[in-house]
Each structure stands twice: as structure tokens, then as C-alpha cells.
């Protein structure tokens, strides 16, 4: 191999290593990174202050089953209904290690379809009805986040997600087995961001 070819190989190899050694990993590496502690809204801050033990329990429950949490993915959020009524929801956003896609393989619609039919119901089952047994909490915001990698399998690329905002009644009915996941989503607000696009409200179609 000539010196020029050796230099070219070294340069390409170094670039690949550099690309794989940097960039966000999109998940919380500790309980402190997983739990959202600071809120601008006074009521949300009160809910956090009163329910820190629940958030810690959720962190332990998911991570003990090797399910990572998105950064600041455990906490509380507000939700305004179509009738312009503001309510407060428990928030759980997971970033499972088993979900990873290559940018050049498949489409964003295919990724969305697989996650919402295969993975979202699976991880929602980790929740318990008692998690929502909190005064002033009207529902659950549950999100599944996943990376779309461009160069290597561990770093780089961008993030996509699905979040659904579901009233407490329908979460409980799903966990009790009274309705299936698809039926639960009929009474949920579903938000997704794909291909680095803006968050969009969608109505999933199951095939």
C-alpha cells in the first residue's frame, strides 16, 4: 500500500471513529438526569414537590428492567383539551435501548408504525394504576423516543418520538385489560416528530 493510500485510510478511519465517539445519546444516565425538578408553573412545581417518591419509584421500575428514561422524562406536565380545559398529567418518557434505526433503512412512516404498534404498548404496561392515584392528576403523558443513526449504532443521528396524552380513565381501562391499546388511543392526543420535523398531532391507523 502506498503512503498516500495509507494516509487516506487513516484519515477515513479517524473520521469514522470521531463520528462514533461524539454526539448525544438521548437518555438519562442517572436518576438526577431522568427526573424533571424545576417548573415555571407553580402547580407543576407543587406536584413535583409532593410526589418525588413516585418519580424515583418509576425510575427504579423502568431501569431495573433495562428500560432507559429520556432526559428529564419523568415528571409532570399540563395539557389543554380541545374544549380549552387545562389539566395536569403525570409524564413518563422512555428511551429503550432496543429501539434504534439506521437512517438509510426504511422510512419514517415505517418507524412510526412499528413503534406505536410493537413498542409503545409494551412499555406502557410497566405503568400501574396506582401511579395515577394522585389528586389533581387527570391523565398520563407517555412518550417513546428512539434514535435514527447516520454513521454508527451508538452515537450521532437524530431523535424521533411518539407521545400520547391519555385521560386517567382510559389508561386504567387499558391496564385492566378492558380496552386494547388501539381503543385507548381513540381517546388520546397523539403527537409525533419524525425526520427532525416539528411536533405534529396525528391519528394513527392500525393495520
Regions found by a protein language model. Name each.
Residues 1-9:
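Bacterial N-terminal signal peptides that target proteins for export
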Residues 18-19:
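C-terminal motif of bacterial Sec signal peptides marking the signal peptidase cleavage site
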Residues 26-34:
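N-terminal targeting/trafficking signals and adjacent low-complexity tails
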Residues 37, 41, 45-48, 52, ...:
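Short edge beta-strands and adjacent turn/loop segments
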Residues 51, 55-66, 119-131:
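Hydrophobic, Leu/Ile/Phe/Ala-enriched alpha-helical segments that form helix-helix packing faces
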Residues 61, 66-69, 88, 133-207:
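Polybasic, proline/glycine-rich intrinsically disordered low-complexity segments
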Residues 98-151:
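Mature extracytoplasmic domains of secretory-pathway proteins
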Amino acid at each position: 500500500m502506498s503512503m498516500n493510500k495509507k494516509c487516506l485510510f487513516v484519515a477515513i478511519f479517524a473520521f469514522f471513529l470521531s463520528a462514533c465517539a461524539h454526539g448525544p445519546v438521548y437518555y438519562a444516565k442517572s436518576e438526577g438526569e431522568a427526573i424533571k425538578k424545576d417548573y415555571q408553573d407553580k402547580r407543576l412545581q407543587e406536584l413535583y414537590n409532593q410526589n418525588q417518591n413516585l418519580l424515583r419509584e418509576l425510575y427504579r421500575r423502568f431501569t431495573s428492567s433495562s428500560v432507559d428514561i429520556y432526559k428529564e422524562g419523568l415528571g409532570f406536565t399540563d395539557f389543554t383539551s380541545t374544549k380549552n380545559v387545562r389539566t395536569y398529567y403525570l409524564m413518563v418518557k422512555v428511551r429503550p435501548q432496543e429501539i434504534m434505526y439506521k437512517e438509510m433503512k426504511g422510512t419514517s412512516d415505517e418507524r412510526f408504525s412499528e413503534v406505536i404498534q410493537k413498542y409503545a404498548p409494551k412499555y406502557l404496561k410497566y405503568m400501574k394504576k396506582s401511579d395515577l392515584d394522585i389528586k389533581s392528576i387527570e391523565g398520563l403523558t407517555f412518550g417513546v423516543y428512539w434514535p435514527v443513526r447516520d454513521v454508527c449504532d451508538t452515537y450521532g443521528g437524530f431523535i424521533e418520538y411518539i407521545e400520547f396524552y391519555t385521560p386517567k380513565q382510559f389508561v386504567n381501562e387499558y391496564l385492566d385489560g378492558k380496552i386494547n391499546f388501539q381503543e385507548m388511543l381513540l381517546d388520546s392526543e397523539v403527537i409525533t416528530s419524525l425526520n427532525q420535523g416539528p411536533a405534529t398531532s396525528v391519528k394513527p391507523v392500525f393495520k
